Amino acid sequence: MRCGPLCRFLWLWPYLSYVEAVPIWRVQDDTKTLIKTIVTRISDISHMQSVSSKQRVTGLDFIPGLHPVLSLSKMDQTLAIYQQILTSLPSRNVIQISNDLENLRDLLHLLASSKSCPLPQARALETLESLGGVLEASLYSTEVVALSRLQGALQDMLRQLDLSPGC
């Protein structure tokens, strides 16, 4: 009897179909590690050393502040806003941080799907239309305030992940 490719495929099928799922604790650990990495990257930017996340700058109210309780969907929405802000900044300091935020959002989506609560698509920030004028007037302040508040928000997210946040 000639078996050919079909028999070989059937013989390999059990090996090909066996896929081991990544344990959710590993995804959560990766999420925490990435958050710590982003916080470290922000701290390493030289002009971020002495800035308070509570600093008030006129015209930058669209940059999210700190939230006491964060669900996975709120974390994703917050990160989406920061990602939009950082991608609109011309500074080279924020390119890697913006890429890391994209990866962090993907990890949050995995955590959410493990809890059977898929995250809604993050809405675009309506107030970013006025960001162009703010950037022209105060590019440095926008970067400093955005990174400072992002750092605080990430530290809040890190604490919330230890408490196993809901949807």
UniProtKB/Swiss-Prot annotation:
> What's a single GO MF annotation on this record?
hormone activity
Cysteine disulfide partners in this protein: 117-167
Q: Which InterPro entries match?
A: 4_helix_cytokine-like_core, Leptin
Q: Where in the cell is it found?
A: Secreted
Q: Which residues form the signal peptide?
A: 1-21
The record's keywords, sorted A to Z, are:
Disulfide bond, Obesity, Secreted, Signal
A GO cellular component annotation here is: cytoplasm
Record GO biological process: activation of protein kinase C activity; adipose tissue development; adult feeding behavior; angiogenesis; aorta development; bile acid metabolic process; bone growth; cell surface receptor signaling pathway via JAK-STAT
Q: Family, per the entry?
A: Belongs to the leptin family.
Record's function text: Key player in the regulation of energy balance and body weight control. Once released into the circulation, has central and peripheral effects by binding LEPR, found in many tissues, which results in the activation of several major signaling pathways. In the hypothalamus, acts as an appetite-regulating factor that induces a decrease in food intake and an increase in energy consumption by inducing anorexinogenic factors and suppressing orexigenic neuropeptides, also regulates bone mass and secretion of hypothalamo-pituitary-adrenal hormones.
Q: What is this protein's name?
A: Leptin
Name the gene for this chain.
Answer: LEP
